[in-house]
């Protein structure tokens, strides 16, 4: 089975605080991976690097065999990498469709035409029997 995701020696520091110290792992296609650790262990920092929110100080990420630059959320999104936060909330000032769009795309995409997203939302609603 081929590798879906390879994290190679990822390190990230905030001043003197070492959040990630040469973290490496491989996730194969179809595998489910859980990252466990105490509060402050660096789990969220690692996820923020993977999703492009932070640039790592050292190391590399490969997604489906291609190097994924860190610190570039648009590239992670285009590769299909996303995250559901542990404590997520919906934005009350947005419609259901807009909340779904920002769960998949960046906030900038709210200014783009919503017709393709609406079509996809309706298809998924039908597929899963949602009103």
Where are these regions (language model features)?
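Glycine-rich phosphate-binding loops of nucleotide-dependent enzymes
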Residues: 1-131
């Amino acid at each position: 089975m081929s590798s879906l995701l390879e994290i190679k020696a990822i390190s990230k520091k905030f001043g003197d605080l070492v959040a990630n110290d040469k973290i490496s792992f491989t996730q194969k296609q179809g595998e489910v991976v859980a990252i466990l650790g105490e509060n402050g262990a660096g789990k969220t920092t690692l996820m923020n690097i993977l999703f492009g929110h932070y640039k790592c100080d050292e190391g590399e990420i490969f997604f489906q065999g291609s190097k994924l630059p860190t610190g570039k959320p648009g590239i992670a999104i285009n590769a299909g990498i996303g995250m559901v936060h542990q404590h997520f909330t919906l934005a009350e000032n947005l419609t259901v469709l807009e909340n779904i769009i920002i769960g998949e795309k960046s906030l900038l995409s709210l200014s783009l035409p919503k017709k393709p997203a609406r079509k996809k939302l309706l298809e998924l609603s039908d597929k899963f029997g949602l009103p």
